[in-house]
């Protein structure tokens, strides 16, 4: 069925899906380059660079790449990094979804393909308007804002700028909650055990970001609450991937997985609704290390349920969210 957005978009419109990024290979050298770019972003590490850079270069980048490379090797596929593969598939699945006038591409905030490179490619293809679409349901300065920062920084260098719009966060959007509920419901139906608890694990952030006014924590809570309502059962909240010595958002996922068996919860399903596609944090940190921690602590059954990835429900959701934003861009009479 032809949508009104398809009928009315201008000659060329670009849609740029953006996710976090990944090393090019599961090797220490590649991981080091990736971590250097990622951890040098002041949106990610909010410490004065004069203080932070010596720590990053002399300690973190000399020790962490080897450990991280081993973790990446455990989840790497023949096609490459799961995050890179799945994000590319999402873009391909949306090709043609809004008519031939709309070009859908993808980029990574860190690593390749770079945001600047893909904006240039869309402009070269004749796109007069570009929708920047960070694939982060919950807004956070360290994810959503830095993606748009990078896009706008490149726009500042362009002589002929396209018109630009950004996809807003969609943590409570009915299309997103419905997609999550359908995906989780279908995955639960395939399990050979009945989980006593569903644990929704979101990427952690320093507690300080919440105190400074970042809405991320509240949006994660709202997503978990709405998903629980849609499923008709409680969804517990936790935060993973903490880094450094500072206090991060609680409860911590790893601590929760170790504590739950002692509370009588021995059968669990873990989901990661803040991630648009499976990646190191879900496939290694949750599905491998999280499983081991839960079972070693007395749990009997553990299931990690996949992210939305490039599933039919995900593509339907993205069509709804993106199509809504394209509605405002009318073709010249």
Positions of PLM-derived features:
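Active-site-proximal alpha-helix that buttresses catalytic centers in soluble enzyme cores
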Residues: 2-333
């Amino acid at each position: 069925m032809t949508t009104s957005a398809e009928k009315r978009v201008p000659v060329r419109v670009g849609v740029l899906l953006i996710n976090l990024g990944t090393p090019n290979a599961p090797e220490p050298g590649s991981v080091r380059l990736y971590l250097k770019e990622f951890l040098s972003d002041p949106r990610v590490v909010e410490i004065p660079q004069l203080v932070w850079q010596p720590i990053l270069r002399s300690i973190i980048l000399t020790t962490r790449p080897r450990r991280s490379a081993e973790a990446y090797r455990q989840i790497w596929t023949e096609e490459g990094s799961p995050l890179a593969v799945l994000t590319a598939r999402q873009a391909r699945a949306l090709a043609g979804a809004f008519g031939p006038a709309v070009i859908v591409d993808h980029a990574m905030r860190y690593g390749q393909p770079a945001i600047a490179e893909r904006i240039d490619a869309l402009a070269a293809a004749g796109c007069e308007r570009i929708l920047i679409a960070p694939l982060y349901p919950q807004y956070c300065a360290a994810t959503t804002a830095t993606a748009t920062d990078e896009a706008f920084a490149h726009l500042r260098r362009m002589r002929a700028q396209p018109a630009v719009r950004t996809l807003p966060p969609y943590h409570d959007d009915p299309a997103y909650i419905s997609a999550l509920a359908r995906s989780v419901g279908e995955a639960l139906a395939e399990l050979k055990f009945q989980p006593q608890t569903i644990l929704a694990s979101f990427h952690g952030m320093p507690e300080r970001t919440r105190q400074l006014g970042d809405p991320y924590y509240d949006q994660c809570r709202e997503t978990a609450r709405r998903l629980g309502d849609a499923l008709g059962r409680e969804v517990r909240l936790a935060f993973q991937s903490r880094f450094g010595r500072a206090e991060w958002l609680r409860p911590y996922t790893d601590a929760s997985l170790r504590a739950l068996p002692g509370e009588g919860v021995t059968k669990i399903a873990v989901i990661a609704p803040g991630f648009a596609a499976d990646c190191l944090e879900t496939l290694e940190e949750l599905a491998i290390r999280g499983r081991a921690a839960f079972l070693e602590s007395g749990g009997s059954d553990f299931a990690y349920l996949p992210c939305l990835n490039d599933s039919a429900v995900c593509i339907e959701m993205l069509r709804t969210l993106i199509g809504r934003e394209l509605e405002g861009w009318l073709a010249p009479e």
